[in-house]
From Swiss-Prot:
<dbReference type="GO" id="GO:0016887">
    <property type="term" value="F:ATP hydrolysis activity"/>
</dbReference>
<keyword id="KW-0539">Nucleus</keyword>
<dbReference type="Pfam" id="PF00270">
    <property type="entry name" value="DEAD"/>
</dbReference>
<comment type="similarity">
    <text>Belongs to the DEAD box helicase family. DDX5/DBP2 subfamily.</text>
</comment>
<comment type="function">
    <text>ATP-dependent RNA helicase required for 60S ribosomal subunit synthesis. Involved in efficient pre-rRNA processing, predominantly at site A3, which is necessary for the normal formation of 25S and 5.8S rRNAs.</text>
</comment>
<feature type="compositionally biased region" description="Basic and acidic residues">
    <location>
        <begin position="1"/>
        <end position="21"/>
    </location>
</feature>
<keyword id="KW-0378">Hydrolase</keyword>
<feature type="domain" description="Helicase C-terminal">
    <location>
        <begin position="344"/>
        <end position="493"/>
    </location>
</feature>
<dbReference type="GO" id="GO:0003724">
    <property type="term" value="F:RNA helicase activity"/>
</dbReference>
<feature type="compositionally biased region" description="Basic and acidic residues">
    <location>
        <begin position="49"/>
        <end position="67"/>
    </location>
</feature>
<feature type="domain" description="Helicase ATP-binding">
    <location>
        <begin position="143"/>
        <end position="315"/>
    </location>
</feature>
<dbReference type="InterPro" id="IPR011545">
    <property type="entry name" value="DEAD/DEAH_box_helicase_dom"/>
</dbReference>
<keyword id="KW-0175">Coiled coil</keyword>
<dbReference type="InterPro" id="IPR001650">
    <property type="entry name" value="Helicase_C-like"/>
</dbReference>
<dbReference type="Pfam" id="PF00271">
    <property type="entry name" value="Helicase_C"/>
</dbReference>
<feature type="region of interest" description="Disordered">
    <location>
        <begin position="1"/>
        <end position="71"/>
    </location>
</feature>
<dbReference type="InterPro" id="IPR000629">
    <property type="entry name" value="RNA-helicase_DEAD-box_CS"/>
</dbReference>
Length: 523
């Protein structure tokens, strides 16, 4: 063995000894750490038992959701003396009259703001909202919790005043900390039309207080949207376009402290769940106040809320656990031959859109875009000035049609279900369902375009044998709103499809017309 080999062997032995010593030290250190940890835990346990009062220590502290630490969450709402002095019987009556239910895990028990006088806001915002007679139920109940920085789930029908319900507290929080830069308020909405509508309402408030607001959605170039995003504190967006902008690095959501998901159930129906989760991950949960507004409260929406909301207060207006129609809407259902529907439509327009009713707004629903395009041509041929929103039209054409209808340039609007939810079109007097939608739930959302903000309205529906599998569900909705049920509809059967089991198959429940009906529940 050469000298070099002997030296090399010695080096290897030394190296192995060093490694062994390091391992031994690490083992001793780990053992010591475990002992100290055990002693510490034992001392803590003894301390908590002191005074013969045993205190239960949570086993998994890390599983608890972090409490918000943002400026938004640290703002505390102070209830006015005038509101505090109201007798409890007045509050109870208000809850009963408006079918309000509040689930309050924090036991705050904040009273609803029955009048704008009980609300203390910046004078410019106060002046804007005071143009209305009084807060809507969702506003009255949600505002105290939102102004206190709490997470809130609002379950209420479309047209209940949800935009101001989340918009007023959002602007109020912004004004309390005007030094911050970047996007602080983010509202996510399922459709371009609804996003534009929310933007139109919010910009009234942001303009009053010198804040910048922008709206981003697909179907238009991104360049202008990128510019607006850099200047805005308030952003209204559809999930798809916002995610595109995030992935290309054009938007920073790290400063968002007020997040709103509007029409959450609708977004899940449209398959946006993963997009929403990816967007939310770009915000800071520790300083984020989160709001969710939804017309229904199915399992999927509940699960989404549980993943990113912190002890949310749930405010429900109306019978939201079951599918119900607005009782201010007169529902008329006619069973007709499918071949005569368009002829029948012309008769209905003479009834609802001529003479003294010539200037009343009428919204007509078709099921598919091809049907809508055909009906649009037919009505124009018959001399009607009609605007239309359906899939064969460009975004610019759809926006123009909606603006014409809102402004009164055209008082007839033909739409597919793209416009069935969320669009706040004031003073729609009549909804005509030329073709029944694919679900009874969509029917309720369609007719909800009328009878809004305390007004009355009419929904006239043409029902054919092709939709007979939906007859039982429609009967339930009619009965639930105390509306007449035509004999021709009952002839199709009064059962509703309730469940489907992989082994048992579909099974049904008959509607007992002698009793108050059990309304449809969507699991």
């Amino acid at each position: 063995m050469t000298k070099e080999e002997i030296a090399d062997k010695k080096r290897k032995v030394v190296d192995e000894e060093v490694i062994e010593k390091k391992k031994s030290k690490k083992h001793k250190k780990d053992k010591k750490d475990k002992k100290e940890k055990k002693d510490k835990k034992h001392k803590k346990h003894k301390k908590e038992k002191k005074g013969e009062k045993e205190v239960e220590v949570p086993e998994k502290e890390s599983e608890k959701k972090p409490e918000p630490t943002s400026a938004v969450a640290s703002e505390f709402y102070v209830q006015s003396e005038a509101l505090t002095s109201l007798p409890q019987s007045d509050i109870d009556e208000y809850f009963k009259e408006n079918e309000i239910a509040v689930e309050d895990p924090l036991n705050l028990a904040l009273r609803p703001l029955l009048s704008f006088d009980y609300l203390s806001l910046d004078s410019s915002i106060q002046a804007e909202i005071s143009k209305f007679p009084k807060p809507t139920p969702i506003q009255a109940v949600a505002w105290p919790y939102l102004l206190s920085g709490k997470d809130v789930v609002g379950v209420a029908e479309t047209g209940s005043g949800k935009t101001f319900a989340f918009g007023v507290p959002a602007i109020s929080h912004l004004m309390n900390d005007q030094k911050k830069r970047g996007i602080q308020v983010l509202v996510i909405s399922p459709t371009r039309e609804l996003a534009s509508q929310i933007y139109d309402n919010l910009i009234v408030l942001t303009d009053k207080v010198g804040m910048q607001c922008c709206c981003v959605y697909g179907g238009v170039p991104k360049d202008e949207q990128r510019i607006q995003l850099k200047k805005s504190q308030v952003v209204v967006a559809t999930p798809g376009r916002l995610l595109d902008l995030l992935q290309e690095g054009s938007v920073d959501l790290s400063q968002v402290n007020y997040l709103v998901l509007d029409e959450a159930d609708r977004m899940l129906e449209k398959g946006f769940e993963e997009d929403i989760k990816n967007i939310i991950r770009e915000t800071d949960a520790s300083k984020r106040q989160t709001l969710m507004f939804t017309a229904t409260w199915p399992k999927e929406v509940r699960e989404l809320a549980s993943t990113f909301m912190n002890n949310p207060i749930k405010v429900s207006i109306g019978n939201t656990d079951q599918l119900t129609a607005n009782k201010r809407i007169t529902q008329i259902v006619e069973v007709v031959d499918p071949r005569g529907k368009e002829r029948k439509l012309l008769e209905l327009l003479k009834k609802y859109h001529s003479g003294p009713k010539k200037n009343e707004k009428v919204l007509i629903f078709a099921l598919y875009k091809k049907e809508a395009a055909r009906v649009e041509r037919n009505l124009k041929y018959n001399g009607y000035n009609i605007a239309a929103i359906h899939g064969d039209l460009s975004q610019q054409q759809r926006t123009q049609a909606l603006n014409e209808f809102k402004s009164g340039k055209s008082n007839l609007l033909l739409a597919t279900d793209v416009a069935a939810r969320g669009l706040d079109i004031p003073n729609v007097k009549t909804v005509i369902n030329l073709t029944f939608p694919l679900t009874v739930e969509d029917y309720v959302h369609r007719i909800g375009r009328t009878g809004r903000a305390g007004q009355t309205g009419t929904a006239h529906t043409l029902f054919t044998e092709q939709e007979k599998h939906l007859a039982g569900g429609l009967v339930n909705v009619l009965n639930g709103a105390n509306q007449p049920v035509p004999e021709d509809l009952i002839k199709f059967g009064t059962h509703t499809k309730k469940k489907e089991h992989s082994a048992y198959g579909s099974f049904f429940k008959d509607v007992d017309l002698t009793k108050k009906p059990k309304k449809i529940t969507f699991d």
